[in-house]
């Protein structure tokens, strides 16, 4: 489903609202692919820094090709300083505009953490967990959307 070279944009602002489970599994998949000699790296764009499963685990699995706009993760910094990850550090307020202007090419995936959903006949409503970040931009730009349901958060 997620392919080598895909650009992914995520919900959240700092670890709040970041999808977590998908990236724990994606880093495991990357390790298996690399062990089999198959390349696998993705680009990750967020509204701020993210969490260990997105930055640290993915960097340790050598599954990150590019990351922007900001990181506070020690494991990610280590791999970036080794030259394993291309990284762009910028003012967080510029990210959504740069996405809309196409600075990062096409966004294959928007990955959004939600606390619940309501399905209707003509529309669906997704309830974000604790922080949206750049969600309104990424869901419009992405070719495909993955929704990660975090049941720890109450949708009400």
Functional labels for PLM-detected ranges:
Residues 1-156:
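Conserved alpha/beta enzyme-core scaffold
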């Amino acid at each position: 489903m997620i392919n080598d070279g895909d650009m992914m944009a995520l919900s959240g602002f700092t670890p709040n609202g970041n999808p977590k489970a998908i990236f724990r599994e994606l880093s495991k998949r990357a390790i298996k692919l690399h062990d089999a000699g198959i390349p696998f790296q993705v680009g990750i764009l967020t509204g701020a820094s993210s969490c260990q499963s997105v930055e640290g685990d993915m960097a340790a699995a050598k599954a990150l090709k590019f990351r922007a706009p900001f990181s506070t993760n020690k494991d990610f910094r280590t791999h970036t300083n080794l030259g394993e990850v291309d990284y762009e550090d910028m003012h967080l307020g510029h990210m959504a505009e740069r996405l809309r202007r196409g600075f990062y090419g096409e966004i294959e995936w928007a990955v959004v953490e939600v606390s619940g959903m309501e399905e209707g006949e003509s529309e669906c409503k997704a309830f974000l967990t604790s922080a949206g970040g750049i969600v309104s931009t990424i869901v419009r730009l992405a070719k495909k959307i993955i929704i990660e349901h975090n049941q720890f958060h109450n949708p009400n």
